[in-house]
Amino acid sequence: GPSFCKADEKPCEYHADCCNCCLSGICAPSTNWILPGCSTSSFFKI
């Protein structure tokens, strides 16, 4: 099944709707332009 991001609990299989769980603990939308350092293809379970 899909992984979930603690910030919004949206399934990460729905790429455009899920958030990026950065190593810093900050989560951002996959379409986020402000935090481009966050991966848009890999999601961390936190």
From Swiss-Prot:
Subcellular location: Secreted
Coiled coil: none
Disulfide bond residue pairs: 5-19, 12-22, 18-27, 21-38
GO cellular component, one term: extracellular region
PTM info: The natural D-Phe-44 form of the peptide is more potent than the L-Phe-44 form.
UniProt KW keywords: D-amino acid, Disulfide bond, Hydroxylation, Ion channel impairing toxin, Neurotoxin, Secreted, Toxin, Voltage-gated sodium channel impairing toxin
Domain of life from the UniProt record: Eukaryota
A Pfam family: Toxin_19
Gene Ontology molecular functions: sodium channel regulator activity; toxin activity
Further comment found in the protein's record: Negative results: does not have effect on sodium channels Nav1.1/SCN1A, Nav1.3/SCN3A, Nav1.4/SCN4A, Nav1.5/SCN5A and on potassium channels Kv7.2/KCNQ2, Kv7.3/KCNQ3, Kv1.2/KCNA2, Kv1.3/KCNA3, Kv1.4/KCNA4, Kv1.5/KCNA5 and Kv1.6/KCNA6.
Modified residues (D-phenylalanine): 44
Keyword Isomerase recorded: no
Cross-referenced InterPro entries: Conotoxin-I_CS, Toxin_19
Signal peptide: none
Record remark on domains: The cysteine framework is XI (C-C-CC-CC-C-C).
Function as written in the Swiss-Prot or TrEMBL entry: Iota-conotoxins bind to voltage-gated sodium channels and act as agonists by shifting the voltage-dependence of activation to more hyperpolarized levels. This toxin acts on Nav1.6/SCN8A > Nav1.2/SCN2A > Nav1.7/SCN9A sodium channels. Produces general excitatory symptoms upon intracorporeal injection and repetitive action potentials in the frog cutaneous pectoris muscle. Natural peptide (with D-Phe) is active on nerve, but not on muscle. Synthetic peptide (with L-Phe) is not active on both nerve and muscle.
Membrane spanning residue stretches: none
4-hydroxyproline PTM sites in chain numbering: 2, 11, 29
Family according to the record: Belongs to the conotoxin I1 superfamily.
Name of the protein in question: Iota-conotoxin RXIA
Keyword Cell division: no
Tissue and organ expression note: Expressed by the venom duct.
